[in-house]
Design a protein with these regions (language model features):
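Sequence contexts marking disulfide-bonded cysteines in secreted/extracellular proteins
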Residues: 2-4, 44-46, 78-80, 170
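Short, hydrophobic beta-strand segments
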Residues: 29-35
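Short beta-strand segments that buttress and anchor functional surface loops
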Residues: 31, 45, 140-144
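Conserved active-site-adjacent core of cysteine acyl-enzyme catalytic domains
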Residues: 62, 83-200
């Protein structure tokens, strides 16, 4: 895109970079890139004595949703096992038929049975979840504490790479098998524990 007036012009823009004129003295440059990409943004002043104020926002897109299959839990207390089922791409019914007790989070048993390795549950944070997504894996996250605990699978992050917000993470909630913002997941208060499944 290009915007201009009689004094100066802001030009540029493609699928990863958007340059927007804010006023006669400022412009906003937004950059979005996958974690494997490197982007650099610069400002060039041609035939002018003054350079406008430029603010640059670095955004990152991490998407691991293709590694999991969404499923709805088949009992009120099988959210954790259903999250594990999503990460090994098996239905909860398949796990049950294979002798897995869905009422308990048998992480290592489920992982080993279907050719995966599991780590956790370990204490977690938004930064830790972000780093795991960046490493290439979805994250099973306990979103609260107490007797009514609930687990979801975090699959995606899209936002600023330095200021993390639960509003910028996307998860699959086994309560209804819907994709939603992490902060809107069932019983969400804050990330508490995390489990990661990796293909053996």
């Amino acid at each position: 895109m290009t915007c201009s007036d009689s004094s100066w012009t802001v030009g540029g823009g493609n699928d990863w970079c958007t340059i927007t004129k804010v006023s006669n003295t400022s412009a906003k440059v937004s950059v979005k890139a996958n974690t494997s990409d490197f982007r650099s943004t610069g400002v060039v002043c041609v035939n002018g004595s003054n350079v406008a104020t430029i603010s640059v926002t670095q955004e990152v897109l991490l998407d691991r949703s293709k590694l999991v299959t969404a499923y709805k839990q088949i009992t009120n207390s099988s959210c954790a096992a259903t999250c594990a089922a999503m990460c090994v791409n098996k239905s909860p019914e398949t796990l049950k038929n294979d002798g897995i007790d869905l009422e308990y989070a048998m992480w290592s048993t489920i992982a080993t049975k279907y050719g995966y390795k599991s780590t956790g549950p370990d204490s977690t944070s938004l930064k830790s979840i972000y780093n795991t997504l960046k490493s290439g894996y979805p994250v099973i996250v306990q979103v609260n504490t107490g007797s009514m605990e609930h687990w979801v699978v975090v699959t995606k992050y899209s936002g600023n790479s330095t200021t993390l917000s639960a509003d910028d993470f996307t998860c699959i909630d086994p309560w209804d098998a819907k994709t939603k913002v992490l902060s809107s997941s069932t019983r969400y208060s804050a990330p508490n524990k995390a489990v990661v499944f990796k293909k053996s």
